[in-house]
Amino acid sequence: MTKISGIYAASMSVLNSDLSLNIEKTISHAENLIDQGCHGTAIFGSTGQAQLIPIAEKIKLLNSLSESKYKDKHLIGTGLNSLNETINFMKISFSLNFKKFLIMPPAYYKYRDEDAINFYTKIVDAVPESRIILYNFEKLCGYKFSIECIERLVQKFPNQIIGVKDSSYNLFEKLKLKNFSVMPGSESKLLKGLESGCSGIITATCNVTSQLSRKVYDDFKENKNQSCNQKLVDVRNTFDKYNLISALHTLYSKKNRIYENLLPPLSLLNKVDEKNLVQSLKNLNFETKSQLAA
């Protein structure tokens, strides 16, 4: 089993004015996050509008990403409900030497742990060399992993099921498995998670907090006093007042208007919320200039 650890951003997707995927700028965006302190990124997570982007565009991006300078530092989100499409997308990704996948179980439908286990079993059977990070986000997909379900999956597939992104926050303090990465989905859980044995975070707001998050992570690993954690938590709590994708694109678009482009039904913040977000970050002395792509 190959764990992942550190600070991972759920990287944003950059779109052209016709709402097609801008491959060059999406890759550049992810690379900038790594340059700013992230250990890696998740490409095509929910923050990257994965469920809204055509598979053909995703594959085209992966072809370019496979030749990029940080090609080994990316997790690939599937963002698909269909089992067969998920498997086919993973096989194409695998052919490009991407082996680590962030996979959310299907949305819309009601099902039990047994059904979730069956879903991942079919994926592992079809792509046995894959390494899978489970995506626990009940708010988005309607299903919440139990500790027992994850324990059963890891017992069944110890070499394939290597971690979980916990955005429902029912696991990160309680799930204890050897050689298994537990990654909360919020900076507000970073330090508490590390103290509980977690491996790091995978979050949307690391698109702007990469430097702060890395500082908190490194200080913990080096047994230094925490000088930045409260500010990091305050910044995350500020973003949590809004739709995260809308807030991030609104903030980035102040430096580069290409970030105004969002796939429906997503949209930018209204002017009142934009003003409040910017002012709240200013009140926190949160400097974003060096972190926004020009």
What are these regions (language model features)?
Residues 2-144, 150, 161:
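Active-site beta->alpha loop and helix N-cap motifs at the rims of alpha/beta catalytic domains
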Residues 31, 91, 191, 250, ...:
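Surface-exposed charge patches
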Residues 49-50, 109-110, 170, 191, ...:
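Short secondary-structure capping/turn micro-motifs that flank functional sites
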Residues 3-12, 36, 195-198, 202-294:
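C-terminal alpha-helical cap/extension of soluble enzyme domains
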Residues 21, 28, 56, 60, ...:
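Conserved active-site and cofactor/substrate-binding residues in soluble primary-metabolism enzymes
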Residues 10, 44, 49-52, 81-83, ...:
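Short, electropositive, low-hydrophobicity segments enriched in small/polar residues
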Residues 124-130, 137-242:
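Catalytic alpha/beta core domains of metabolic enzymes, predominantly
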Residues 104-105, 183, 264:
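Hydrophobic alpha-helix-in-membranes signature
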